[in-house]
Amino acid sequence: MFLIYLFVQTAESSWLSKTAKKLENSAKKRISEGIAIAIQGGPRRRRFVAEQDAIHSRVSREVPTLSDSV
């Protein structure tokens, strides 16, 4: 029973360390890409932000103007 516990513990810690390393590498890659874009002077990329035109057209349809309410 103890040997099975040790085996599972080793496998789990190995998986956790690999996952943590992947997350760390992903974060480093995103940071380096952001620095490269900033140095080149390009536009900043934002993650998970809706298109501004889509928001603007939706707001203009939903919000009544003053002439509509009079």
Curated annotation (Swiss-Prot):
Pfam family name, one: Cecropin
Please give the residues making up the propeptide in this record.
45-70
GO BP term, example = defense response to bacterium
Arranged from A to Z, the UniProt key words for this protein are: Antibiotic, Antimicrobial, Secreted, Signal
Q: What induces it?
A: By bacterial infection.
Q: Which N-terminal residues, if any, form the signal peptide? A: 1-13
Q: Which family does it belong to?
A: Belongs to the cecropin family.
What is the name listed in the Swiss-Prot or TrEMBL entry for this protein? Cecropin-P1
Source gene? ASCEC-1
